[in-house]
């Protein structure tokens, strides 16, 4: 079997040090520049993915709060289609 020291996980931890927070706890801090950039990129990507979903939910919530005749008709038709589809498949 190979030695544990050869695994990429063990080698990659060499880039991590700790920093003290205000409450005295220590948290890991990435010192490697590429790792920090990667984390920033992932955070930005996640924000771009989550934002449209939040907008859709917000619009749905607004339409429920003050429905217009058109939005009510759309909701009823969608429900009816789903119900009909379910009836045909079961």
Curated annotation (Swiss-Prot):
Spans annotated as Mitochondrial targeting sequence: 65-87
Q: Where is the protein situated, by its record's location annotation?
A: Host mitochondrion inner membrane; Host nucleus; Host cytoplasm, Host cytosol
Stretches with biased composition (Basic and acidic residues): 19-34
The organism's superkingdom is given as Viruses
- Coiled-coil segments: none
* Keyword entries, A-Z: Apoptosis, Host cytoplasm, Host membrane, Host mitochondrion, Host mitochondrion inner membrane, Host nucleus, Host-virus interaction, Inhibition of host innate immune response by virus, Inhibition of host MAVS by virus, Inhibition of host RLR pathway by virus, Membrane, Modulation of host cell apoptosis by virus, Viral immunoevasion
Q: Where is this site: High pathogenicity?
A: 66
Q: Where is this site: Important for pathogenicity, S is highly pathogenic whereas N is low pathogenic?
A: 66
Residue ranges of the region described as Disordered: 1-34
Q: Name one Pfam family in it.
A: PB1-F2
Q: Name one GO biological process term.
A: symbiont-mediated perturbation of host apoptosis
Record-level GO cellular component terms: host cell cytosol; host cell mitochondrial inner membrane; host cell nucleus; membrane
Q: What else is known?
A: Is not encoded in all strains, and seems to be dispensable for replication. South Carolina isolate has been sequenced from formalid fixed-lung tissues of a 21-year-old male which died in 1918 at Ft. Jackson, SC. Brevig Mission isolate has been sequenced from lung tissues of an Inuit woman buried in the permafrost in a gravesite near Brevig Mission, Alaska. This sample was recovered by John Hultin, retired pathologist.
Instruction: Name the family the entry cites.
Output: Belongs to the influenza viruses PB1-F2 family.
The UniProt entry, under HAMAP family, shows: INFV_PB1F2
Name of the molecule in the record: Protein PB1-F2
Corresponding gene?
A: PB1
